[in-house]
């Protein structure tokens, strides 16, 4: 159930129409989790600054039950920053990604939890 959230000051109109689908496929492959469980939440047009500049930037989070940790996070960071740079023109040095390894008992879905 990986969830990837992106808050950005980039306007919606400049984002590719395939953004959600692309990120879903990218994360399904990277995490080894089924695409059916991947959730993507993009919040464009945010009032944001990074380093006292309002140039394009993003603050993101990737949450998952498992598949989060040291070497994996470095790999995800590279993959996601590369995508955001290529598709949204956000330089990698203007992106923060917070990683969260979730306890299955604390994640609800379909009227129950993953525990």
Swiss-Prot record:
Among PROSITE patterns, the record links this protein to: MIF (PS01158)
User: What name does UniProt use for this protein?
Assistant: Macrophage migration inhibitory factor
Presence of the UniProt keyword Methyltransferase in the record: no
Active site residues according to the UniProt entry: 2
Name one process (GO BP) from the record: inflammatory response
Its function, per the record, reads: Pro-inflammatory cytokine. Involved in the innate immune response to bacterial pathogens. The expression of MIF at sites of inflammation suggests a role as mediator in regulating the function of macrophages in host defense. Has phenylpyruvate tautomerase and dopachrome tautomerase activity (in vitro), but the physiological substrate is not known. It is not clear whether the tautomerase activity has any physiological relevance, and whether it is important for cytokine activity.
Residues binding substrate are 33, 65, 98
One MF term in the entry's GO annotations: dopachrome isomerase activity
Give the catalytic activity. Answer: 3-phenylpyruvate = enol-phenylpyruvate; L-dopachrome = 5,6-dihydroxyindole-2-carboxylate
Question: What are its GO cellular component terms?
Answer: cytoplasm; extracellular space
Where does the UniProt annotation locate this protein?
Secreted; Cytoplasm
Q: What class of enzyme is it?
A: isomerase
What is the species of this protein? Xenopus tropicalis
UniProt-listed Enzyme Commission number(s): 5.3.2.1, 5.3.3.12
Q: Which Pfam families match?
A: MIF
Q: How does it assemble?
A: Homotrimer.
Output the superkingdom of the source species. Answer: Eukaryota
Assigned keywords, A-Z: Cytokine, Cytoplasm, Immunity, Inflammatory response, Innate immunity, Isomerase, Secreted
Family, as annotated: Belongs to the MIF family.
């Amino acid at each position: 159930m990986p969830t990837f959230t992106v808050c950005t000051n980039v306007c919606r109109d400049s984002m590719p129409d395939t953004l959600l689908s692309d990120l879903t496929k990218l994360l399904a492959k990277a995490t080894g989790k089924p695409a059916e469980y991947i959730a993507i939440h993009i919040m464009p047009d945010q009032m944001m600054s990074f380093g006292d500049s309002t140039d394009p930037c993003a603050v993101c989070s990737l949450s998952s039950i498992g598949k989060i940790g040291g070497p994996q996070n470095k790999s995800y960071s590279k993959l996601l920053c590369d995508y955001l740079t290529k598709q949204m023109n956000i330089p990698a040095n203007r992106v923060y990604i917070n990683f969260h390894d979730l306890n299955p008992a604390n994640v609800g879905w379909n009227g129950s939890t993953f525990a």
